[in-house]
Amino acid sequence: SDGTVDITKSYEGIEGSIVTIDGGTISVVSSDDGINCAGGSDTGSTDRMGADQFSSQDGVELNINRGTVTIDAEGDGLDSNGNFTMTGGTVCVCGPTNGGNGALDYNGTATVTGGTLIACGAVGMEEGFGDNSTQYSVLHDLGSTVSANEKLTITDSDGKEILSFTPTKTWQSVVFTSADLKEGETYTITAGSQSETVTIDGIVTSNSKGKNFGGGHGGRRGF
């Protein structure tokens, strides 16, 4: 559960039908998905095409329980053709820059009960955690694209920094979750010259019109 994995160049960094992270430090740079959980043979990006591209696969899981995970992906950051469950750990995702992929991508459910995650990507296919979670999360699309290497900060109403990350790619959509988020509280998202506020009004707060159009398993419209 400890140790270091440093993948500096890959097509898909980590791939399997069930991927469980219980500790350690993992860093992935990929030309497609950072972590990909799928059943069947490896058919590359074509396994997402066809009539059943959004159907959930039985026995396919991505589980993050502990550890530190950093993803720099041209495709989906964290991709599960089944379920995604996060109970702990720290996760930072950078990418994708094209609207055909998402920082998070799942076909089943995405549940967060603990840990910290901040994931930045393009607008178009973005997804957040589902309302079956027990920890608050936000999926927020900014008004315009943020340049690469601009620091992103999430601060509370007192100006205390809750989360921060400096993506190395352009982005417009962010997913974040932390045990510090509280219902009814207002938080400020600052990135480059942009600054927007969001008020937590439920287990999932979202203004996204992405893959699930702000509803379904990606979470409801929050404001």
Regions picked out by a protein language model, each given a short descriptive name:
Residues 1-223:
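A composition-driven surface/loop motif
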